[in-house]
């Protein structure tokens, strides 16, 4: 998915606000992908928005309890 790739590129470059925007757009299209919730959580955590990040990690675990990235 192009939105996810752009988000990952921004995340890797340290541009967390832009990364977050792309992951939020991707989630509008697919809210059942635990990886997207993890990417959003990492972006939020990097921005110091820890409570929101925790909510996203928890959402990822709700979708896939075996998700090693969110646990």
Identify the meaning behind each predicted range:
Residues 25-28, 58-62:
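Conserved structural position within tetratricopeptide repeats
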Residues 12-13, 46:
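Register position in tetratricopeptide repeats
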């Amino acid at each position: 998915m192009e939105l996810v790739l752009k988000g990952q590129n921004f995340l890797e470059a340290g541009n967390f606000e832009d990364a977050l925007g792309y992951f939020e757009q991707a989630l509008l299209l697919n809210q059942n992908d635990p990886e997207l919730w993890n990417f959003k959580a990492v972006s939020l955590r990097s921005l110091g928005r820890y409570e929101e990040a925790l909510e996203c990690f928890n959402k990822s675990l709700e979708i896939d309890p075996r998700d090693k990235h969110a646990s």
